[in-house]
Swiss-Prot record:
Primary localization: mitochondrion
GO terms assigned for molecular function: structural constituent of ribosome
PANTHER family for the chain: CHLOROPLAST 50S RIBOSOMAL PROTEIN L22-RELATED (PTHR13501), LARGE RIBOSOMAL SUBUNIT PROTEIN UL22M (PTHR13501:SF8)
General function of this protein: Component of the mitochondrial ribosome (mitoribosome), a dedicated translation machinery responsible for the synthesis of mitochondrial genome-encoded proteins, including at least some of the essential transmembrane subunits of the mitochondrial respiratory chain. The mitoribosomes are attached to the mitochondrial inner membrane and translation products are cotranslationally integrated into the membrane.
SUPFAM superfamilies: Ribosomal protein L22
Family the UniProt entry places it in: Belongs to the universal ribosomal protein uL22 family.
InterPro entries for this protein: Ribosomal_uL22, Ribosomal_uL22_bac/org-type, Ribosomal_uL22_sf
One Pfam family from the record: Ribosomal_L22
Protein name according to UniProt: Large ribosomal subunit protein uL22m
Protein location: Mitochondrion
Comp. bias regions, Basic and acidic residues: 72-98
Transit peptide (residue range): 1-22
Gene Ontology annotations for the cellular component aspect, listed alphabetically: cytoplasm; mitochondrial large ribosomal subunit
């Protein structure tokens, strides 16, 4: 009886008096929203659980019934979504992700007392060059900061061979860039008792080394991209109709 009363409270907005169905000495008939609710409720697991545990039948609330129905819908939607994801074809791996899959070694140098412009020109000089060619360029350069960049290159080579297992004979500088470090500030005295703060720039150099394996994979990707490209076909030769004697856009 408790279960029937709770069911009546839940469905109060969906039932109207009639002589069709008798519940608790009152007659009601279904509206359309209640009909769908009864169908889902009769097919759910709530009735089976209540039949197994009749003692707990009157302890359930109306909100629990609706929440159980909502959970059943969520579970079915989740299963359908997982099936669609499994059937979906595997997406193509992006070029940036393929670069991270290749073996490489990254090293950041110590803080160097120089400006971004001066070090940036030297880094552009050795970017995408073989390792020993880049090292020779830094050793033969007359710039003061070049010897510190050469030291960073040597340290990167030793760590790349020992830790990353790269081939020393086929190393090349894949990327090299400059980043700003914390500037040094100094209080200086100027004329007529004036003072100012002198800022000395400092930078860090980051170098990425790769070997021949990554270079061959890159060439293979480029070749595959050219092969997938649609072949260009010229337009057919056709006569010009309605030709005018003056220029038209």
């Amino acid at each position: 009886m408790k279960y029937i009363n709770q069911f009546m409270k839940i469905s109060k907005g969906f039932l109207v008096p009639s002589s069709t169905i008798g519940l608790n000495s009152k007659t009601y008939h279904y509206k359309f929203p209640l009909l769908s609710f009864v169908r889902e409720f009769s097919n759910g697991s709530y009735l089976r659980e209540s039949a197994q545990n009749p003692a707990n039948l009157g302890s359930q609330k109306g909100s629990d019934i609706f929440s159980m129905l909502a959970n059943q819908k969520d579970d079915s939607n989740r299963q359908q979504k997982e099936e669609r994801v499994k059937e979906r074809p595997r997406s193509r791996i992006s070029f940036k992700k393929q670069e991270t899959m290749d073996p490489s070694y990254t090293l950041q140098s110590m803080v160097l007392r120089s400006s971004l412009k001066k070090v940036g020109a030297l880094c552009r000089q050795i970017a995408h060059k073989p390792f020993y060619h880049a090292l020779l360029q830094m050793k033969m350069s007359d710039k003061k900061i070049s010897k510190y960049i050469a030291t960073a290159l040597v340290s990167a080579r030793e760590n790349a061979v020992r830790e990353a297992g790269l081939d020393e004979s086929t190393l090349y500088v894949d990327q090299i860039w400059v980043g700003k470090a914390k500037y040094l500030k100094k209080l200086i005295t100027m004329g007529r008792g004036g003072r100012a703060i002198e800022r000395s720039p400092r930078v860090r150099v980051t170098v990425v080394l790769r070997d021949e394996r990554a270079l061959l994979r890159d060439l293979q990707r480029r070749q595959q991209r050219l092969e997938r490209k649609k072949v260009w076909t010229p337009l057919p030769n056709r006569p010009i109709y309605l030709k005018s004697n003056f220029f038209t856009c």
